C-alpha cells in the first residue's frame, strides 16, 4: 500500500513538473531576445550607464517580455488545430496537448496583467505602446496573419514598437534616419522569416499558414534582397547624417580623421560589420534556417560574432572616455 502511495506521489510530481515545463515552453522565453530592441534608444543617447534610465528600460524590457509571451500563447491557442499538421509546430505545448487550452488562456491573461501593471508605473506613452502591441498581435492571431504582405508588415511593426517604446520610457528622441534603419531591419527580418518558412514546408499540402500559400519564392527573394540592401544603406546614412557624438580614450590619433570626416562620424566604421551581418543572415534565410530569428541570433557563431563586434565598437566609440566633440 505504501509503495502504491509513493508511486502515486511520484506520478503527481512528474505531472506537475511536465505541466510547469509546458507552461514555460509555451511562453517561449527565447523570444525575449527581440525585446533587447528596447535598449536601442538608451544606447544611442549616451545614457546606457545612467542607473535610473537603465532601471526604467529594464522594467520596460520585463513588461514586454510578459506581453510577448502572452501573445505567443494566444496565437498558439488560435492555431492549435492547424499546428498539429506542421512538421515543427506540432510539438508546441498547446498543439501537442501538453498544456490544455484552458490553462494556456489563464497563463496568457496573467502575463497580460503583469505587463500592463509594469507599464502603468513607467510612462503613459509606454503604456499605450504595450496596449498597441497587444492589440496588433491579437488581431494578427485572429486573421491578419492570413493576408499576404500585411502579415509581414505587422511582424515588422512589432520590432518598431519595441524600439520606440524604449525611447518613450526615457523621453528620448530618435532621428528620422534611425527610424528608417529600424523599419528596414524589421522588414528584412520579417520577410526572411516568411522565406525560411516557405523553404521548410516544401510540400504545398503541408502549408498551414494561409498567407504562405499565396507567396512565391521569387517574390520573397526580392523582398529579402530589397530590405537587406535598405538596412545597410539606411544604417550608413544614419552614421553619416545623424551619428551620435563620439567619446574616445587615449587613441586620440583617431581624432585626426576629423580632418576629412569629423569625429562624430566614427560610427561609419561599423558599416562593413553591418554588411557582413546582413549577408550572413541572407545566407541563413535561403538555407531555411531563419524561421525563428531569435534562435539564429543566439546560435549562429558568425552572426553572433558580428553582433557582438558591432555592439562593442559602438559602445567603445560612444562611451570610451574623454569627449572629442569639437576637435
Listing of model-derived features with the role each one plays in the protein:
Residues 2-24, 142, 160-327:
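C-terminal membrane-associated helical module and adjoining short loops/tails
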Residues 39, 43, 113-117, 135-139, ...:
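Alpha-helical transmembrane segments of multipass membrane proteins
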Residues 43-49, 121, 139-143, 192, ...:
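Structural signal for the C-terminal ends of transmembrane alpha-helices
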Residues 52-56, 124-130, 148-152, 173-179:
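Short, aromatic-rich membrane-interface segments at the entry and exit
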Residues 64-95, 144, 150, 191-199, ...:
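Acidic (Asp/Glu-rich) catalytic motifs at the cytosolic membrane interface
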Residues 80, 85-130, 176-188, 222-228, ...:
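Multi-pass membrane catalytic core of lipid/isoprenoid biosynthesis enzymes
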Residues 148-158, 300-303:
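Cytoplasmic-side transmembrane-helix entry/capping segments in multi-pass membrane proteins
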Amino acid at each position: 500500500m505504501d509503495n502504491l502511495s509513493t508511486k502515486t506521489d511520484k506520478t503527481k510530481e512528474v505531472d506537475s513538473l511536465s505541466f510547469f515545463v509546458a507552461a514555460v515552453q509555451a511562453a517561449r522565453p527565447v523570444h525575449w531576445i527581440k525585446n533587447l530592441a528596447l535598449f536601442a534608444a538608451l544606447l544611442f543617447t549616451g545614457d546606457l550607464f545612467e542607473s535610473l534610465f537603465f532601471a526604467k528600460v529594464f522594467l520596460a524590457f520585463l513588461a514586454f517580455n510578459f506581453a510577448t509571451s502572452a501573445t505567443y500563447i494566444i496565437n498558439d491557442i488560435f492555431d492549435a488545430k492547424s499546428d498539429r499538421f506542421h512538421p515543427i509546430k506540432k510539438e508546441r505545448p498547446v498543439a501537442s496537448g501538453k498544456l490544455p487550452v484552458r490553462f494556456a488562456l489563464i497563463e496568457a491573461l496573467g502575463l497580460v496583467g503583469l505587463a500592463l501593471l509594469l507599464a502603468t508605473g513607467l510612462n503613459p506613452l509606454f503604456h499605450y505602446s504595450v496596449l498597441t502591441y497587444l492589440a496588433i498581435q491579437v488581431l494578427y492571431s485572429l486573421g491578419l496573419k492570413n493576408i499576404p504582405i500585411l502579415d509581414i508588415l505587422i511582424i515588422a511593426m512589432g520590432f518598431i514598437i519595441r524600439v520606440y517604446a524604449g525611447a518613450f520610457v526615457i523621453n528620448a528622441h530618435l532621428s528620422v534616419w534611425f527610424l528608417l534603419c529600424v523599419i528596414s531591419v524589421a522588414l528584412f527580418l520579417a520577410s526572411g522569416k516568411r522565406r525560411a518558412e516557405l523553404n521548410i514546408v516544401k510540400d504545398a499540402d503541408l502549408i498551414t499558414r494561409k498567407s504562405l500559400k499565396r507567396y512565391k519564392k521569387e517574390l520573397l527573394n526580392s523582398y529579402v534582397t530589397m530590405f537587406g540592401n535598405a538596412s545597410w544603406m539606411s544604417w550608413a546614412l544614419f552614421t553619416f547624417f545623424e551619428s551620435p557624438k563620439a567619446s574616445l580614450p587615449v587613441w586620440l590619433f583617431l581624432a585626426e580623421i576629423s580632418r576629412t570626416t569629423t569625429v562624430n562620424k566614427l560610427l561609419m566604421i561599423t558599416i562593413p560589420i553591418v554588411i557582413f551581418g546582413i549577408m550572413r543572415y541572407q545566407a541563413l534565410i535561403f538555407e531555411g534556417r531563419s524561421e525563428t530569428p531569435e534562435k539564429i541570433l543566439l546560435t549562429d557563431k558568425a552572426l553572433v560574432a558580428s553582433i557582438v563586434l558591432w555592439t562593442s565598437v559602438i559602445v567603445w566609440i560612444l562611451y570610451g572616455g574623454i569627449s572629442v566633440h569639437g576637435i
